[in-house]
Amino acid sequence: MQGKAIKYGDNIDTDVIIPARFLNTSDPKELAEHCMEDLDREFKNKVKEGDILVVGENFGCGSSREHAPLAIKASGISCIIAKSFARIFYRNAINIGLPILESREAVDGIEEGDIVSVDVDNGIIRNVTKGTEFKAQPFPEFIKEIIKYGGLINYVREKVR
């Protein structure tokens, strides 16, 4: 996957990703309309399909809500690269099939607007704009399968056939 980097800092919690006032719906399109709006009012206009979210430490901390990764995925973000993720967000992202990678070096080496290419299977992150490459820990095979099928529910459906 390849897209433009959209970059934010540390400790972005789930209440910032999708504010509680919008939790009365689980419609991905509606969630996408309000994704990150308390942090960046232009987020929904800034994101194009396939863009890559690049964030700092402890991304997705706070309340456990599947709405947060759903909103990000529905907004068009194809992958999140972070210095670190809150564990519950990490699991929720995998469960809905949103690719996520941890790499401090990549986050430090990518600027807003850079074109970034990601090979999730092998944990390779390339800053196409700067010609640099970074490594992240690739997922185990079963996690790759969950992401490939678009989330845990689709994965289970496929396996029980």
Curated annotation (Swiss-Prot):
The keyword Amino-acid biosynthesis applies. GO terms for biological process: L-leucine biosynthetic process. Pathway: Amino-acid biosynthesis; L-leucine biosynthesis; L-leucine from 3-methyl-2-oxobutanoate: step 2/4. It comes from the Bacteria. It is an enzyme of class 4 (lyase). Its EC number is 4.2.1.33. Catalyzes the isomerization between 2-isopropylmalate and 3-isopropylmalate, via the formation of 2-isopropylmaleate. Belongs to the LeuD family. LeuD type 2 subfamily. Heterodimer of LeuC and LeuD. This is 3-isopropylmalate dehydratase small subunit. It comes from Caldanaerobacter subterraneus subsp. tengcongensis (strain DSM 15242 / JCM 11007 / NBRC 100824 / MB4) (Thermoanaerobacter tengcongensis). The gene is leuD.
